[in-house]
A protein has these predicted regions:
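Auxiliary Fe-S-binding modules of radical SAM enzymes
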Residues: 4-60, 129, 253-397
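Canonical Radical SAM [4Fe-4S] cluster-binding loop centered on the CxxxCxxC motif
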Residues: 79-120
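Generic structural signal for well-ordered alpha-helices
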Residues: 87, 125, 152-156, 179, ...
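Core AdoMet radical
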Residues: 106-122, 128-149, 154-219, 228-235, ...
Length: 397
């Protein structure tokens, strides 16, 4: 097959490195069939499970480069060359859950635990606002200390001081009533990765107290309330297959979230999955491109995990179709303690340094960081109970 050409062949080179000798000349016809699936996805914004599986399992460097070109066209149509920044505040690494892949899981006695005070969090917001951030993301483990009363007080305080900013929460599974209380207090968006749609796969990644069904119900509740909703999954998690990824894409297709966050699985040394192989850059980039074709108006981050597994990971994510980056506004003294996975980047730089570095990185590939709320251009439709019941698909396709 011909060598990759074009300015983004650096991305395609990773396919050859990570999947050597997989393709032969006899597969050209099959690759042409996969190309037709790409264009069907672009035109119809949907595929069947079998088509998703074939596209993911049969990906090639040439197919990837064509995908990335299409994805960039879609992103430029709706968002131009603007890259939105979110100020990430990791305010607690206490968590009641014991997910098998997570470095802040309850059973990890080697984790150095911390909680930021309300004053600390507001200080992070103040610094972020001065640096031009207009979206703050409060992320943390499921920490019982932060009751609904404490959370609503915190949300109200942030929105009172920064009414022109969007506030995103990423604090896990809560009751409908809790989600409603946060929304009433002023929260705009909520990020909750579904991690994997398949219930059996979910059970291999989590203890019995956590289920795929409850996770998905939380997402439908968030949609029902009126949040701008974000979901997503790890790429290359243990036991993951192309068929399971196809189900993830079908679920996202049904959910129609305003944001999708995906990143490679990276093992943490103090978890049961410490010896498992990490997810790959090439598959993560390929899936980013597919997500952009399926949901052209979606907000799609180039995640910190991408930057962790490759020095140019975030830039490559942007070139694959992403349009969001999330610099860390947490105090430098605690960043090294919020380690969901090993070797996380940007744990030592000050917030201003992270912002300046990202601007340089984005400018080098022809994009510009903008200081705006950066709302999704997808419509936020408040689902009724009847609507969520009708679209809340079962655990089998």
């Amino acid at each position: 097959m011909p060598k990759c050409a074009g300015p983004f062949s650096m991305i395609a080179a990773h396919f050859r490195k990570e999947k050597p000798g997989l393709y032969s000349d006899c597969e050209v016809i099959y690759v042409d069939d996969l190309r037709s699936l790409l264009y069907r996805l672009k035109d119809q914004r949907s595929l069947t499970k079998e088509e998703w599986t074939a596209l993911i399992a049969g990906r090639t460097p040439e197919l990837a480069e064509e995908l990335f070109s299409l994805a960039r066209q879609e992103r430029h149509t709706w968002y131009g060359h603007d890259i939105y920044i979110r100020g990430l505040i990791e305010f607690t690494n206490y968590c009641k859950n014991d997910c098998f892949y997570c470095g802040i899981r309850r059973s990890n006695r080697n984790a150095s635990r911390y909680r930021l005070s309300k004053e600390d969090i507001l200080s992070c917001c103040r610094l972020g606002y001065e640096l031009g951030f207009r979206t703050f993301v409060l992320q943390g483990g499921e920490d019982g200390y932060f009751t609904d009363i404490r959370m609503t007080d915190l949300i109200e305080s942030i929105k009172k001081q920064y009414p022109d900013c969007a506030l995103t929460l990423s604090i896990g599974e809560k009751s409908y009533e809790s989600y409603q209380a946060y929304y009433n207090a002023g929260a705009d968006r909520y990020l909750l990765r579904h991690e994997t749609f398949d219930s059996k796969h979910y059970a291999k990644l989590h203890p019995p107290s956590l289920t795929a069904g409850n996770r998905q119900e939380c997402l439908w509740n968030l949609k029902r309330i009126g949040y701008q909703v974000g979901t997503g999954f790890m790429v290359g998690s243990p036991f993951q297959t192309p068929e399971l990824l196809a189900e993830d894409m079908l679920f996202i297709q049904k959910l129609q979230p305003q944001m999708v966050g995906i990143g490679p699985f990276i093992p943490h040394h103090d978890t049961p999955f410490a010896k498992e192989p990490a997810g790959t850059l090439e598959l993560t980039l390929f899936l980013l491109g597919l997500l952009r074709l399926m949901l052209p108006k979606v907000l799609l981050p180039a995640t910190t995990a991408l930057g962790t597994i490759h020095p140019k990971g975030r830039e490559l994510g942007i070139l694959a179709g992403a349009n969001v980056v999330m610099p860390n506004l947490s105090p430098a003294k605690v960043r090294g303690d919020y380690l969901l996975y090993d070797n996380k980047i940007c744990t030592n730089e000050e917030a201003a340094e992270c912002r300046a570095l990202l601007e340089k990185q984005m400018a080098a590939i022809g994009y510009q960081v903008v200081t705006a709320r950066g709302d999704s251009k997808m419509q936020t439709h408040v689902l009724t109970f009847e609507e969520t019941t009708s679209v809340n698909i079962s655990h089998h396709f």
